[in-house]
Amino acid sequence: MLRAGGRRLLAPGLRRVLGGGAAAPVAVGGAKAYHERVVDHYENPRNVGSFENDDPSVGTGLVGAPACGDVMKLQIRVDESSGKIVDACFKTFGCGSAIASSSVATEWVKGKQMEEVVTIKNTEIAKHLSLPPVKLHCSMLAEDAIKAAVKDYEAKKAKLAQKGEEKAAEA
């Protein structure tokens, strides 16, 4: 991705046509641009940042795609009493589709129960963003990052429970 004069250019020779109309990729000179949802989440990513790893209410998923070099860190903060995800954030090093997939994933997991978020499929993210087949790996990373964050949170929770049992046995 290039940045010129405060505006991001999607690729040389491509322009976004702004205004009302269908939410579809814009073709200029035979090349397809990103879908407007990808552009929106890339230019205005939601929930960028990170939480403290040692916070017991935080689960961290770190995944990567060696083929393209994309790396995605997605974190969730869970209300321990309700099991509901109350916040989420991400940091992604990768293409616009990877950043958009991360941004969408954090939006979708907020306010949901842990059991719900592990059912989010990459195909749903890809469909929402209208990702082309060559970019499906970006949505797969987002799905994997969600599952890894949930697994990390559950492992932390189990470790804390075990420590609590050990302390109770010592007393």
UniProtKB/Swiss-Prot annotation:
One Gene Ontology term, aspect cellular component: mitochondrial matrix
Keyword Mitochondrion: yes
Localization terms from the record: Mitochondrion matrix
Recorded superkingdom: Eukaryota
Molecular-function annotations in GO: 2 iron, 2 sulfur cluster binding; ferrous iron binding
Main location: mitochondrion
Induction line: Down-regulated in roots when grown under iron deficiency conditions.
GO biological process: [2Fe-2S] cluster assembly; [4Fe-4S] cluster assembly; intracellular iron ion homeostasis
Protein family membership: Belongs to the NifU family.
Subunit field text: Component of the core Fe-S cluster (ISC) assembly machinery.
Function field: Scaffold protein for the de novo synthesis of iron-sulfur (Fe-S) clusters within mitochondria, which is required for maturation of both mitochondrial and cytoplasmic [2Fe-2S] and [4Fe-4S] proteins. First, a [2Fe-2S] cluster is transiently assembled on the scaffold protein ISCU (ISU1, ISU2 or ISU3). In a second step, the cluster is released from ISCU, transferred to a glutaredoxin, followed by the formation of mitochondrial [2Fe-2S] proteins, the synthesis of [4Fe-4S] clusters and their target-specific insertion into the recipient apoproteins.
Name under which the protein is recorded: Iron-sulfur cluster assembly protein 1
